[in-house]
């Protein structure tokens, strides 16, 4: 009888252990799924928050330039300019403070300008209104001829600093973003958003804003990510424009297969 009791007890213990193991496995799986769901949710939230932060920077730049273009189209008399080439001088004097004050109100933009088309000027001067922040953070009027080149650059569409101009002209009615390039007039690498301004089908010029690359990198590095997460700014082809410093310290940017894996199903921003 004692042997039978021992056998029953042993069987009972085995069943209890097995039941506990099954229960523990189910609980572990449930906890893992819950934990994964929480992690995925937090990662999605963090990613969306960072994307929204960067979107605000670019949308502010786009909105400011688009508004500026609408104002110029409305208040610049292109027909008067074609009849009296000196009209542009008085216009620049009157409108220069407007561009200066507009730049002061655009958060995270470091330059704002209106480049007039040479085709409506007498080419006797640099017809451009350009304000930018210098390295000391001072808002200053910027000389577009400081690198010794002005009208020559309008003859070469491949000139690095002129993509903002020719790219905008090639896309009438919409704004364009450039890839990062070195602007020799101010000694800064920038990305630019620009848009061509027309009146009665006549090109007045191109308005645009600059965001210094180092400023964008600083914005990206200042964004808090979980577990030292990496941030990338891509164009519509998933080509890298700017990356956070911790991403540059890895081999992710040099590994084509890894980069394709990272950018798979990702919509870049131009």
Language model features: what each stretch is:
Residues 6-12, 19-93, 101-104, 108, ...:
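Juxtamembrane extracytoplasmic/periplasmic/luminal helical "stalk" adjacent to the first N-terminal
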Residues 97-106, 167, 218-223, 265:
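Amphipathic alpha-helical regulatory segments at dimerization interfaces
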Residues 102-174, 180-187, 239-260:
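Extracellular/periplasmic ligand-sensing ectodomains of membrane signal-transduction proteins
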Residues 128, 192-193, 228-230:
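Short loop/turn microsegments at loop-to-beta-strand junctions
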Residues 175-180, 266-270:
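PAS and PAS-like sensory modules
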Residues 186-224, 236, 242:
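Conserved beta-strands of PAS-like sensory domains
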Residues 214-270:
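Intrinsic low-complexity, intrinsically disordered coil/linker regions enriched in small/polar
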